Amino acid sequence: MNRGERLALRHYRRRGYRLLAANARVGRYELDLVLRRGRRILVVEVKEKGGDAFGHPLEMIDDEKPRRVLTAGAGWVAAHPELTGLEVAFEAAGVRGRHVERVPLT
């Protein structure tokens, strides 16, 4: 897990989420974080930038990334039948310094 993923995980843990998987491989895709809080599963794509010189970290998400994250996330959840019936949501987390900004991917 890289620095940005660790900072994002800390951010989500403070909000009551617990980690189910990090850097989980689903076919040729990778899911940065898969989290759970109550009956909600949250799949998170994490992007990090060290400074402001080259824009915001969330600008690194191209038009195809949400589709890939949704496809991989659905595959990961399907492979875990104990999670059937839970709400599944998808987000991107942009990490800059110690600040984490969250945006929905759906």
What residue spans do the PLM features occupy?
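A short, N-terminal amphipathic alpha-helix
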Residues: 71-78
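Generic alpha-helical structural signal
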Residues: 6, 70-71
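Short, conserved glycine- and acidic-residue-centered signature motifs
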Residues: 1, 5, 61-66
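Short acidic/glycine-enriched loop/turn segments that link adjacent beta-strands
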Residues: 26-29
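Domain-level recognition of nuclease-like catalytic cores that cleave nucleotide substrates
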Residues: 79-106
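Acidic-basic catalytic patches of nuclease active cores, encompassing PD-(D/E)XK
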Residues: 1-22
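Conserved catalytic cores of phosphodiester-cleaving nucleases, focusing on short active-site segments
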Residues: 12, 31-57, 61, 69
